[in-house]
């Protein structure tokens, strides 16, 4: 049952069959949680600012006599609040203050003797703060930091898919990726030698790195190979027999066991032979000496008598060598066990091409590769190698990297050091060799277990650390210089590098983006966006198909539908609805536990890696009343594949059918009936919908509308329950419920609303209250609607009555025919607010001045300006009008004697200033709704600035006074009830002044204390009010902090009302987009037998080939929903009984849907029912959740209940002839959006204007006031017509024949309409370019 007060006003009928196990999570948590983690001091020091400080501090001087230690940090209060920052164009940030301790050690005394300790708090720059809605205000504009999907640190094994070598041989490689530090790659070449690369440089044999780690040849061989032991006995050679090793080999001699020949010479050894040998239990067999020749020695063999090396490790044995061994008294020797199949001799081969023999040579070789051209020294080489992978300052795998590294190498524990160890490198090589030997598989780098999310907090921390490292260098320098006794921590730290790093990240990083603020959905989607681009990510050009493609692990984590079209497709994704990141940054999605075929309500979040181990059923599996899976075979997913399994084998089940898709896709009703390409366009176009003048909830929704509207932060949501005490257009006051009060608090919540402000996309942000005085509200109730919301539900467009039929070719190729009624009723009218600013600077020739005294400008042009030269609020302006008058000093020109004389007589003339006023751009018209004036400190404010200041002060005082009065009333109300409860009569109190109430004395000691507490609260409130007002006053009065050289900034805000017109782009939610071709008079539109005309006529041919059938179902369901509303409306007009209305509503809400979501009308009070009925008269809102929506039968039932034809088709009549069309037409209600591609912004014309410098052709594009390009194809068209003279004119005088242009102008002035075409400038450019190639080319006249 619906419980919130707002929802009761208009209950959406839900067709969903599955009950909701998990509430939709808070949609912005990925941003807010990540940044909170960054700012909160983590006692472990594992993440956030704390981690950055701990990783850089303590900083020790080079000599070790001083150390700067980090103690703690705190964030101060921001100077301005979010709104003030946006108006003033500054960053919303807080100062960071860090407590540092400088410890000085005594040089002479024993090491570690402390001489002096100084502790001090140091300012370390400003940290931008996140607003409550997950955005940052940087230089006055709202920005979003998009999360990044990057390759997780760890170790990855891969191959080149046979592309590197011409033979098509698959070459395997391994790569160790740290969180920061050098990459380490191992790779095979076509000859099966193993190489190593550091940071993708020149490759070296892989054994070099082992030698650098102090391995000898013998140790390398015993680490990587199994050995075969041979024994020399009585002149015979006996081999240790390990039967398993012989499988698949061909016997080169008879293998004898117990006198029987088990395998004859030349036969392949099979599993049967091996079983016989194992049965015989032989441990050694005799082999011919030739069998041993050519095997590789595993050890160095040194002659005990002479001490000389007889056989080096990794050399092939010869007959002579074996004889020598025997002579020298060696009874046993070992060789490497290799074979072609699964024990390759790769390391042994690699050792042969490795020129280094000891550690130093290996280090020098690595040094030469990393620093070519520098002479290596022993220390430098050792230092370099040490710093590459074994120094915590330069290399960090991070906890994630270590976890991934250890789990890939199948180690039991997942924690360890952030640097590499000797074992790590050896294990990676072993694993790579095992993969090359066919014992393991390569990784899939597009698997979401190998890609992790880096969110705001983590990226900010990395940037902060970069700044700190820069500071560390400077501190070390300072510590080694000069007198340490006089130095304070403050003197050591320069906050500039830190501020610069942080500022650069928030201001200009690729992932810090200008927020898409078209509507609430575009905001929420932008904050939930996951990009694979950006620093440390992919680039558009290099990303192949695999990275962009949908991967099985995307299920429930990233949306398979919502991604941009074009070059970024698949690189920018959107989080799925229920998805979240785990502690390591991998995406998880929730599943319900299934035990023995019974579904429980226990929910587990699984990451992509964990998910692979389980069998997971879909959310729409059939379930009986006991929550037991019904079917014998159930479709499910296991290890990334879809299969069928028995109920008992199933371990988990999806939480909800919509967990696959993102927020935008989950707002498309009947998504399951749309083709994926169109769904992609649908989810992208919803983000471009412009908020209409009056928001209209969708009749056919999906049930996600409320979550989006509330979570996006455009609505005002109650923080606590209570009763509405006061409402006007700009504030709502709630009297809080007694049980939700904090001790000693006034119990009043005041919500201020945003009025007519500009969004990033120039749309209008305005909040309207949707509650009235006396209404009860609960925590989380919507109190005021924002842009594109209607009663707390997302409302991006309008419900339009549409007909699918051709209409005189006006809906050819997706064009849309719209009725004039839509324009008259302002259904698709939008308000756009533009900000124009005028800056007065201090120039070399003197200051610019804002004034109404502008040279050579008539009275008419100044009519809209006040005496300060600034336009009035409320003035209606059009292109070319002056908004702010400004004059700029001109350079002194040489005056003629005559002018000097005139000057002397008439005083200064206005010739030394030029007009540089702010004018309205061409093609823009609108009303001035606000003017802001910012004046630099120390510059006198003009009259207008003072007026603005006075108004702000008045408003601030009024706001605070009202706020104070409300809170004061609350305090007196409590005092009054306390006094009345203690025997004071109403009359007695009404005679006393209110302030005297607080001075009364009561008999009850406890009550007296309570009254005194109330009196104290009143005093505190008064002081708080005075303090707040003073702070506000100071902020308003003080000069503004403007950029250097700027004296004044005037910002003018224009509101433009845009009605719908031909050329505007509209769309439905199913990717069905089109451009308006004609606004048709109402009387010409097709109408039904009741005389109701349709609003929009769409082309039926737009449906079959696009395969977005969802729009047809939406239209049918919309017709039914509207029909129910009309029926309720008729019942109200006929003044039917409330009981009858209740009964009808109950029938409507009971139709279809699940038992869990039933709505019991009987539980609503009469007033509630009246409100509900009033809100349903325009149509019954229905929800058809994604993949769990209304069935065809249910739509038909609802149509029947609404007295509409079940086919959804009706006979229409031609508005012009009055004749019926020859067959029935599908008519219904579709939710249509007006997209932010308005013809007003695109239409553009030019006659003359600026020209390109080199080619002298007109510029292109509206922004440059360019011309229309007469391109190659247009030239062909004129050629085809044989219109030679027209063509000549187009390519010469109308384009870039400079002399021809000026001559033609002169001719026209003289009244002679002839033209003389000359040589186009671009031809001259071509000549010059050919000459630049050294070819002389000249035009000779005949």
UniProtKB/Swiss-Prot annotation:
Pfam families: RNA_pol_Rpb2_1, RNA_pol_Rpb2_2, RNA_pol_Rpb2_3, RNA_pol_Rpb2_45, RNA_pol_Rpb2_6, RNA_pol_Rpb2_7. One of its GO terms (cellular component) is DNA-directed RNA polymerase complex. InterPro entries: DNA-dir_RNA_pol_bsu_ext_1_sf, DNA-dir_RNA_pol_bsu_external_1, DNA-dir_RNA_pol_su2, DNA-dir_RNAP_su2_dom, DNA-dir_RNAP_su2_hyb_sf, RNA_pol_bsu_bac, RNA_pol_bsu_CS, RNA_pol_bsu_protrusion. The keyword tRNA-binding does not apply. One of its GO terms (biological process) is DNA-templated transcription. PROSITE patterns: RNA_POL_BETA. CDD domains: RNA_pol_B_RPB2 (cd00653). It comes from the Bacteria. Its EC number is 2.7.7.6. Keywords: DNA-directed RNA polymerase, Nucleotidyltransferase, Transcription, Transferase. GO terms for molecular function: DNA binding; DNA-directed RNA polymerase activity; ribonucleoside binding. It catalyses: RNA(n) + a ribonucleoside 5'-triphosphate = RNA(n+1) + diphosphate. Belongs to the RNA polymerase beta chain family. DNA-dependent RNA polymerase catalyzes the transcription of DNA into RNA using the four ribonucleoside triphosphates as substrates. The RNAP catalytic core consists of 2 alpha, 1 beta, 1 beta' and 1 omega subunit. When a sigma factor is associated with the core the holoenzyme is formed, which can initiate transcription. This is DNA-directed RNA polymerase subunit beta. It comes from Tolumonas auensis (strain DSM 9187 / NBRC 110442 / TA 4). The lineage of its organism: Bacteria, Pseudomonadati, Pseudomonadota, Gammaproteobacteria, Aeromonadales.
């Amino acid at each position: 049952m619906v419980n919130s007060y707002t929802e009761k006003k208009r209950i959406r009928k839900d067709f969903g069959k599955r009950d909701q196990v998990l509430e939709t999570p808070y949609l912005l948590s990925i941003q807010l949680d990540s940044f909170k983690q960054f700012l909160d001091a983590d006692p472990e020091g594992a993440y956030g600012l704390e981690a950055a400080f701990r990783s850089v501090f303590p900083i020790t001087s080079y000599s070790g006599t001083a150390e700067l230690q980090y103690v703690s940090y705190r964030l101060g209060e921001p100077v301005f609040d979010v709104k003030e920052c946006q108006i003033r164009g500054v960053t919303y940030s807080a100062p960071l203050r860090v407590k540092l301790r400088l410890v000085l050690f005594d040089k002479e005394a024993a090491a570690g003797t402390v001489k002096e300790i100084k502790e001090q708090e140091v300012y370390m720059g400003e940290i931008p703060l996140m607003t409550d809605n997950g955005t940052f205000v940087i230089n006055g504009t709202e920005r979003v930091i998009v999360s990044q999907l990057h390759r997780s640190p760890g170790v990855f094994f891969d191959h080149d898919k046979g592309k590197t070598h011409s033979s098509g041989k698959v070459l395997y490689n391994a790569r160790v990726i740290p969180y920061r530090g050098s990459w380490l790659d191992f790779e095979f070449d076509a000859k099966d030698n193993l190489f190593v690369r550091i940071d993708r440089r020149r490759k070296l044999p892989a054994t070099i790195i082992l030698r650098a780690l102090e391995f000898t040849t013998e140790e390398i061989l015993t680490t990587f190979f199994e050995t075969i032991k041979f024994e020399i006995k009585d002149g015979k050679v006996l081999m240790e027999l390990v039967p398993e090793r012989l499988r698949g080999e061909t016997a080169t001699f008879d293998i004898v066991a117990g006198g029987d020949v088990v395998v004859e010479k030349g036969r392949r050894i099979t599993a049967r032979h091996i079983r016989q040998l194992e049965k015989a239990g032989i441990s050694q067999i005799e082999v011919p000496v030739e069998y041993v020749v050519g095997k590789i020695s595993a050890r160095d063999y040194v002659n005990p008598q002479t001490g000389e090396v007889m056989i080096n490790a990794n050399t092939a044995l010869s007959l002579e060598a074996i004889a020598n061994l025997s002579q020298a008294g060696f009874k046993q020797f070992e060789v490497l066990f290799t074979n072609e199949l699964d024990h390759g001799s790769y390391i042994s081969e690699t050792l042969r091409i490795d020129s280094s023999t000891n550690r130093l040579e290996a280090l020098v070789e690595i040094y030469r590769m990393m620093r070519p051209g520098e002479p290596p020294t022993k220390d430098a080489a050792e230092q370099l190698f040490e710093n590459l992978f074994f120094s915590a300052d330069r290399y960090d795998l991070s906890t994630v990297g270590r976890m991934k590294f250890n789990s890939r190498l199948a180690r039991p524990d997942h924690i360890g050091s952030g640097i590499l160890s000797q074992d790590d490198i050896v294990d990676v090589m072993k694993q790579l060799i095992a993969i090359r030997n066919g014992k393991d598989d390569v990784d899939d780098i597009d698997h979401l277990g190998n890609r992790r999310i880096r969110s705001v907090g983590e990226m900010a921390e990395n940037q902060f650390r970069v700044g700190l490292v820069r500071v560390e260098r400077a501190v070390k320098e300072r510590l080694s210089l000069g007198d340490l006794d006089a130095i304070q921590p403050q003197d050591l730290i320069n906050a500039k590098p830190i501020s610069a790093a942080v500022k650069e990240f928030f201001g200009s990083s690729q992932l810090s983006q200008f927020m898409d603020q078209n509507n609430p959905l575009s905001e929420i989607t932008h904050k939930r966006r996951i990009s694979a681009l950006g620093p440390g990510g992919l680039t558009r050009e290099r990303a192949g198909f695999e990275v962009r493609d949908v991967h099985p692990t995307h299920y429930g984590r990233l949306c398979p539908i919502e991604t941009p079209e074009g070059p970024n497709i698949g690189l920018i994704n959107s989080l799925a609805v229920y998805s979240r990141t785990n502690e390591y940054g991998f995406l998880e999605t929730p599943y319900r536990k299934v035990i023995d075929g019974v579904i429980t309500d226990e929910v587990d979040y699984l990451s992509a890696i964990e998910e692979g181990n389980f069998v997971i059923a879909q959310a729409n599996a059939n379930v009986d009343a006991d929550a037991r899976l019904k079917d014998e075979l159930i479709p499910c997913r296991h290890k990334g594949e879809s299969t069928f399994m028995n109920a008992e084998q199933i371990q988990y089940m999806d939480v909800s059918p919509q967990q696959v898709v993102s927020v935008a896709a989950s707002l498309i009703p009947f998504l399951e009936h749309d083709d994926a390409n169109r769904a992609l366009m649908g989810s992208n176009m919803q983000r471009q919908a412009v908020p209409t003048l009056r928001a209209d909830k969708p009749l056919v929704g999906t049930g996600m509308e409320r979550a989006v509207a509330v979570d996006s932060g455009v609505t005002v949501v109650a923080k606590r329950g209570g009763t509405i005490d006061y409402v006007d257009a700009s504030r709502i006051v709630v009297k809080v419920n007694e049980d939700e009060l904090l001790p000693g608090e006034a119990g009043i919540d005041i919500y201020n609303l945003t009025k007519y402000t500009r969004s990033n996309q120039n749309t209008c942000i305005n909040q309207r209250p949707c509650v009235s005085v006396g209404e009860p509200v609960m925590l989380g109730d919507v109190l005021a609607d924002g842009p594109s919301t209607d009663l707390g539900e997302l409302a991006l467009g309008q419900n339009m009555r549409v007909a699918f039929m051709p209409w005189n070719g006006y809906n050819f190729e997706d064009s849309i025919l719209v009725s004039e009624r839509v324009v008259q009723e302002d259904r698709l009218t939008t308000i756009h607010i533009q900000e124009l600013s005028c800056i007065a600077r201090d120039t070399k020739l003197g200051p610019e001045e804002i004034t109404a005294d502008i040279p050579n400008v008539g009275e008419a042009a100044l009519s809209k300006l006040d005496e300060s030269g600034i336009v009035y609020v409320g003035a209606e302006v059009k292109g070319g009008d002056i908004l702010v008058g400004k004059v700029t000093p001109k350079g002194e020109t040489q005056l003629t004697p005559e002018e000097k004389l005139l000057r002397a007589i008439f005083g200064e003339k206005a010739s030394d200033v030029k007009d540089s006023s702010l004018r309205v751009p061409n093609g823009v018209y609108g009303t001035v709704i606000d003017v802001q004036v910012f004046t630099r400190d120390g510059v006198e404010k003009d009259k207008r600035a003072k007026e603005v200041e006075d108004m702000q002060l008045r408003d601030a005082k009024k706001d605070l006074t009202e706020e104070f009065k409300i809170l004061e009333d609350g305090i007196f109300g409590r005092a009054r009830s306390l006094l009345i409860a203690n025997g004071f009569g109403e009359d007695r109190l009404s005679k006393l002044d209110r302030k005297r109430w607080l001075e009364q004395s009561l008999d009850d000691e406890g009550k007296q204390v309570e009254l005194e507490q109330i009196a104290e609260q009143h005093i505190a409130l008064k002081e708080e009010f005075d303090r707040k007002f003073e702070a506000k006053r100071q902020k308003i009065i003080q000069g503004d902090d403007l950029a250097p050289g700027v004296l004044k900034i005037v910002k003018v805000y224009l509101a433009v009302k845009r009605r719908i017109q031909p050329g505007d782009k509209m769309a439905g939610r199913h990717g069905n987009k089109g451009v308006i071709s004609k606004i048709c008079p109402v009387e010409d539109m097709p109408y039904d037998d009741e005389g109701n005309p349709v609003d929009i006529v769409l082309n039926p041919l737009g449906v079959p080939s696009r395969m977005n059938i969802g729009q047809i179902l939406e239209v049918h369901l919309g017709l039914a929903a509207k029909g129910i509303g009309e029926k309720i409306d008729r019942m109200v007009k006929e003044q039917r009984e409330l009981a009858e209305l209740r009964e009808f509503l109950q029938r409507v809400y009971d139709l279809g849907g699940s038992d869990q979501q039933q709505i019991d009308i009987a539980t609503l009070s009469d007033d509630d029912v009246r409100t509900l009925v009033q809100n349903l008269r325009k149509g019954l809102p229905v929800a058809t959740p994604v993949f769990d929506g209304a069935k065809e039968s249910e739509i038909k039932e609802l149509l029947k209940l609404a007295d509409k034809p079940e086919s959804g088709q009706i006979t229409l009549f031609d508005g012009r002839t009055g004749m019926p069309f020859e067959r029935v037409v599908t008519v219904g209600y579709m939710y249509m959006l007006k997209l932010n591609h308005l013809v007003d912004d695109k239409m553009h014309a030019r006659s003359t204007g600026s020209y390109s410098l080199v080619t002298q052709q007109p510029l292109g594009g509206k922004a440059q006031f360019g011309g229309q390009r007469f391109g190659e194809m247009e030239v062909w068209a004129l050629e085809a017509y044989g219109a030679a003279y027209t063509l000549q004119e187009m390519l010469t005088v109308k384009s870039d024949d400079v002399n021809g242009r000026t001559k033609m102008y002169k001719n026209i002035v003289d009244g002679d309409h002839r033209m003389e075409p000359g040589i186009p400038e671009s031809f001259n450019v071509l000549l010059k370019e050919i000459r630049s190639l050294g070819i002389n080319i000249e035009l000779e006249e005949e």
